[in-house]
Amino acid sequence: MEKYKIEIKESAVKEFNSIPKKDLKKIVQKIRSLSDNLRPNGCVKLSGQERYRIRQGDYRILYSIENEILVVYVIKIGHRKEVYR
């Protein structure tokens, strides 16, 4: 299986400033691991959308996969209470 390129949407990058550094480091590691494993253990497909969710502590990472061009788009990162709004 080929490695997928990771692209983080600008709106998701803006969320980095509001996340504590100890959590941010783990979130970045989780995002990097998506290039090797698109659907890791605990990954959930969101209903009604072609998006997936993975957990990192109290934070959620929402992403979509473009198989034709081998890209994973990280769409949103946020606290579990706010990320789905």
Predicted segments with their positions:
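Enriched for short, Lys/Arg-rich terminal
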Residues: M1-K25, Q56, S64-R85
